[in-house]
A protein has these predicted regions:
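Non-catalytic structural scaffold of enzyme domains
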Residues: 1-217
């Protein structure tokens, strides 16, 4: 059994990507809607929530767990050793994919307030390409729009203008899988963190019956 957690729809996007790769995976998905959004929480609160979420998924039999949330992934190094066991963050793998995708090494990051403030994507990108130019924009209102089924057009346009001259955009919140095609229509490469996470998790899947348990709070 594998597990996935997020505060909302972003985790559902990751689960959908996992199903494309491994329809036989037995999975449990926890959506912590009670504490959504994670992107505005303090670091201390986020550590507590992430460790609790991991514990919940393990209680349902999950051995390998995807943090399907870039914001929660920023505090992965702060989790206890026991809570890090078998847990997959998505910042570094997403940054690596962006560096590989970018031709001019000018990379934009669309993310939540806490993720941008942490500088996690910038650090990870430069670990893979020290000369990369990185622009980051916090688009918290875009998270709300996607979570509540609202229009994303204006937020996407404003965010892309703020990012400037780039050729690759990291969708640095798994919710932003919803705007991947809009980014591509602007002639930019879009790196989908939900898909990257699902690919990482799929490598740990043991063949099962394809059941999914949904936990909501």
């Amino acid at each position: 059994m594998v597990g996935i957690f997020d505060s909302g729809k972003g985790g559902a996007f990751a689960l959908a990507e996992l199903r494309k790769l491994r329809p036989d995976a037995d999975a449990v998905f926890f959506a912590d809607r009670k504490n959504a959004p994670y992107g505005t929480k303090s670091q201390e609160t986020l550590v507590a929530l992430a460790e609790r979420d991991i514990g919940i998924l393990r209680s349902f039999g999950a051995d390998d767990i995807l943090i399907a949330c870039c914001t929660a992934s920023t505090v992965y190094p702060l989790l206890s050793r026991e809570h890090r066991r078998g847990v997959i963050p998505i910042i570094d793998a997403t940054a690596r994919a962006a560096v590989r995708s970018s031709k001019n090494k000018r990379i934009g990051v669309l993310a939540t307030e806490l993720t941008v403030r942490s500088g996690a994507f910038e650090t990870a990108i430069r670990n893979h390409c020290k000369d990369a130019e990185v622009s980051s924009v916090s688009v918290q209102r875009l998270v709300f729009a996607i979570e509540n089924g609202g229009s994303t057009d204006e937020s996407v346009e404003d965010a892309l203008r703020s990012l400037g001259d780039i050729d690759t955009v990291i969708l640095g919140c798994t919710h932003f899988a919803a705007i991947e095609e809009k980014i591509k229509k602007e002639g930019l490469a879009a790196v989908n963190s939900a898909r990257i996470g699902a690919e990482l998790l799929s490598e740990r899947v043991k063949s099962g019956s394809g059941i999914t348990l949904y936990i909501n709070e």
